[in-house]
UniProtKB/Swiss-Prot annotation:
Annotated organism of origin: Synechococcus elongatus (strain ATCC 33912 / PCC 7942 / FACHB-805)
Name this polypeptide is given: Alanine--tRNA ligase
Source superkingdom: Bacteria
Lineage start: Bacteria, Bacillati, Cyanobacteriota, Cyanophyceae, Synechococcales
Subcellular location: Cytoplasm
Binding site for Zn(2+): 560, 564, 662, 666
Length: 876
């Protein structure tokens, strides 16, 4: 039986539901910005669970399943050139934390692939680690896979380790066979032309010590990964991942802008279209998760991807800004699974436009130098010059080659590579003398000074010693007024950002010294105070008075305790199974993300708000205790899944209301919160909702703003506040009636115009052809006019009408009679092709179709092309 043609969204949902049915908790995708400071981006589905696998924290559930968005750029040059390399991909995974192991994981995987996804068993082959006889036996004896379809591979391919020491274990992979007719002789699972790996099962069963010895782990874990794009390729029967419904709509949108037909293009054009389709998925998610383009870290990854998009756009003839436009397609394609894309759409488009424009200016400068080089060259551009273009101006080598070829010249690639190698050597030599970044400097300082002691739970002011001082990430001995610095103290009352709560603000003072502290972060065990010296000189070893801004701290405390009350109210009113997925506790607001498959209703939100304000009014005392984590769990304390906890934990208890593990600062009594108000509730990812709220003085500030808006509306509508709703409803009904009347008038006008146009039809053979532009007619009226004209012209009538009802927008309509359709002309296909001239597309039925475009300046060209094409097609 052939594999069912499931959509990418259906494959994802089927996978997650399957494992929910096997006792796994569905968890949302983590951000592309990982909590692990050693990793630049989230590169695998297991990364959010790495602390659990390494034994650094205890799992809150025994089984979990996720669809994790990931980014990898290590094979970026292969993107678009192979069937399966990507920068952005989704990794479907099922995980066991000390629960089931090899036998169950293999059985689950086989059941899912063969019974649920209905992939024929004869199309599958598996690999095991060469020494893993247990897995081999399970596949052969319990699953029934023939020995000839099981291949033993070495540690390079089939043994996972987190590092030279620590948890590790063998892997087993399921491969899809595109050519089973080739048989099993000489089976080579690494043959990419025949096999594709679709499912990887990692069995974490050993601990490796410094001597390389393996000992069995007490708790064995399972980590699996199924590439969504790869499984979509298999189930949808397409030749590569790019032609699945997960990516191809983006490629089609790019092709429309470039006026290209993907199916008939050369391989080089297809590569560029695939690169753009892939990278647009990556950059939209990176920006949505808070990354901005820069020359460092994640920002550089984003900048590089955007520039590759622009470069490949130019290679296929796109000579205008287009990334923000294509982002609309990417967002529309993925927003159902990742609602934050829609919420961040404006920011995504703005960042893309800004970075694209910056790169286009860079290219423009490079093109001027290239023009000079072309004029001076006889047969070849020197490699050193091409490298200057690349290194100094950011001008891609491929673009230099393309332009040179147009002039009949070549580029000295060997010279370019030599210049590149020399630059790498210079960079490596320079790196040895460069001062370290903040993180690197602190790692070095950790060998010399003790971690910061936090005294801020009880003290708002403390005398402390400056143990380290950094300026622009470099360790210095002193800094002066005007310098922006990072300061490490031996102990501090300043809370460092963690657990969703922002870092404290305040001042450091000394003799003739004032340092304004704007933020505090925790790095390598140190509390790093970020601020600016307003007066005086600060030196390592100085004694300073550290004082937090008490007003800011009180607001943060109120918001943090209110967040705990919010989670308790959600569990009480909506669903006991709700769990925290993230939070923000700022001075002016709070945000709480939680796992929930549906929206919280307005009535539930009202009940939640009322319940929290009731708890506030009841003036519950807050009890803070430090206890063993096992004791806390036994008492029913709520922990956030995925958060790191030590053996001893801090418990915040509002007796009878809430008990949570938390390291943040809180009010001593709920009455100190004052008031609580929900601002909004929305989805941020599949199965994840977000509530934003204010507490304490911020409620009054929020209500004052709302009150000012209501007063302004009352003045505008000359109505009392309580009458505004009725007044707006009346205006909406009036507007609706006016719009209906306007539409009718436009239709009458279009019909009147169309009646006058009948005489302008021209005979082509035995057909009557009418192609015209109507001014200011909307889509509905244009369609009515086209239908009426075609009916008047008869069965052999062909009508194409165009209009630009809004600035920059184009509407096109085609109406064909039966005799025209009999000649092989179909309105949908015809008008869709014409619309490409205006940068758009569309379609419809053979007899009537509508299309749109984005470039009104091309409307005359489109109308002329429509007439020419109709004449040619009908005459032939």
């Amino acid at each position: 039986m052939a594999a069912p043609a499931l959509s990418g969204d259906q494959i994802r949902e089927t996978f997650l539901k399957f494992f929910e049915g096997k006792g796994h908790r569905r968890l949302p995708s983590a951000s592309l910005i990982p909590e692990d400071p050693t990793v630049l981006l989230t590169i695998a589905g297991m990364l959010p669970f790495k602390p659990i696998f390494l034994g650094q924290q205890v799992a809150e559930v025994p089984r979990a399943t996720t669809s994790q968005k990931c980014i990898r750029t290590n094979d970026i040059e292969n993107v678009g050139r192979t069937a399966r390399h990507h920068t952005f991909f989704e990794m479907l995974g099922n995980f066991s934390f000390g629960d089931y192991f090899k036998k169950e994981a293999i059985a689950f995987a086989w059941e899912l692939v063969t019974e649920v996804f209905q992939v024929p068993a004869e199309r599958l082959a598996v690999s095991v680690f060469e020494e893993d006889d247990e897995a081999f036996a399970i596949w052969r004896d319990q699953i029934g896979v023939p020995e000839a379809r099981i291949q033993r591979l070495g540690a390079k391919d089939n043994f996972w380790a987190s590092g030279p020491t620590g948890p590790c274990g063998p892997c087993s992979e399921i491969y899809y066979d595109f050519h089973p007719e080739l048989g099993n002789d000489g089976l080579d699972l690494e043959d990419d032309s025949r096999f594709i790996e679709v499912y990887n099962l990692v069995f974490m069963q050993y601990n490796r010590d410094a001597a390389g010895n393996l000992t069995a782990l007490e708790k064995q874990n399972i980590d699996t990964g199924m590439g969504l794009e790869r499984m979509a390729q298999v189930l949808q029967g397409v030749p590569n991942n790019y032609e699945t419904d997960l990516i191809f709509p983006i490629i089609q949108a790019v092709a429309a802008i470039a006026q290209r037909d993907y199916a008939s293009e050369s391989e080089s054009v297809k590569v560029s279209l695939k690169v753009i389709g892939d990278h647009l998925r990556a950059v939209t998610h990176l920006i949505a998760d808070g990354v901005t383009a820069s020359n460092l870290g994640r920002g550089y990854v984003l900048r590089r991807l955007i520039r590759r998009v622009v470069r490949h756009g130019r290679l296929i003839g796109i000579d205008r800004p287009f990334t923000a436009e294509i982002a609309e397609t990417a967002i529309a394609l993925m927003a159902a699974q990742y609602p934050n894309l829609r919420e961040r759409e404006a920011a995504i488009k703005a960042e893309l436009t800004r970075e694209e424009q910056r790169f286009l200016e860079t290219l423009e400068r490079g093109e001027k130098l290239l023009a000079e080089l072309l004029a001076a060259a006889t047969d070849q551009i020197r490699g050193e010059d091409a490298f200057v273009l690349y290194d100094t101006y950011g001008f891609p080598l491929e673009l230099t080659q393309e332009i040179a070829e147009e002039k009949g010249l070549t580029v000295d690639l060997a010279g370019f590579e030599a210049a590149m190698a020399a630059q790498r050597q210079r960079s490596q030599a320079a790196h040895e003398t460069i001062d370290l970044t903040v993180q690197g400097s602190l790692d070095r300082l950790a060998e010399q000074i003790h971690p910061t002691e936090f005294v801020g739970y009880g003290d708002a002011v403390a005398t402390a010693k400056v143990t380290a001082l950094l300026r622009e990430g470099q360790s210095v001995e002193a800094a002066e007024a005007g310098d922006r610095v990072q300061i490490v103290l031996d102990h501090t009352p300043f809370y460092a950002e963690s657990g969703g709560q922002v870092g404290d603000r305040g001042v450091l003072t000394g003799e003739s010294l004032i340092v304004r502290i704007e933020d505090v972060q925790k790095e390598s065990g140190f509390f790093v105070h970020y601020g600016q010296i307003e007066r005086g000189l600060l030196q390592v070893g100085d004694s300073v008075t550290a004082q937090i801004d008490r007003a800011c701290r009180r607001r943060a405390q109120a918001n943090h305790t209110a967040t705990h009350l919010l989670q308790a109210a959600l569990k009480l009113i909506v669903d006991e199974g709700i769990s925290q997925a993230g939070s923000l506790v700022a001075f002016d607001r709070l945000r709480f993300d939680f796992n929930c498959p549906r929206a919280v209703t307005p009535e539930e939100l009202r009940q939640i708000e009322d319940q929290i304000n009731q708890w506030i009014a009841e003036a519950h005392g807050t009890v803070v205790e430090v206890m063993p984590i096992a004791t806390a769990k036994a008492k029913g304390a709520v922990a956030m899944f995925g958060e790191k906890y030590g053996a001893e934990v801090r418990v915040i208890d509002v007796p009878g209301v809430s008990m949570e593990l938390c390291g943040g600062t809180h009010v001593a009594n709920t009455a100190e919160i004052g008031l609580f108000k929900i601002i909004s509730e929305a989805g941020v990812a599949s199965g994840v909702r977000r509530i934003e709220a204010v507490a304490g003085p911020a409620v009054l500030e929020y209500l004052n703003v709302r009150d000012a808006v209501v007063r302004d509306l009352s003045d505008r509508f000359k109505a009392k506040p309580e009458e505004l709703s009725d007044r707006v409803t009346a205006l909406q009904e009036e507007l609706k009636a006016n719009q209906k009347q306007l539409t009718a008038l436009k239709a009458e006008l279009a019909i009147a115009k169309s009646d006058a146009l009948v005489s302008q039809a021209i005979p082509v053979g035995d057909a009557q052809v009418l192609v015209e532009t109507l001014t200011g007619v909307d889509a509905a009226a244009l369609q009515t006019a086209a239908e009426r004209l075609q009916q008047k012209l008869g069965d052999a009538g062909a009508v194409v009408l165009g209009s630009s009802p809004e600035e920059g927008k184009v509407t096109l309509v085609a109406a064909f009679g039966p005799a025209i359709i009999a000649k092989g002309l179909k309105a949908g296909q015809f008008i869709g092709g014409i619309a490409k001239i205006c940068g758009g597309g569309g379609g419809g039925r053979p007899n009537l179709a509508q299309a749109g475009g984005r470039d009104a300046s091309k409307l005359p060209e489109a109308i002329a092309a429509a007439l020419d094409q109709l004449k040619t097609a009908i005459a032939s």
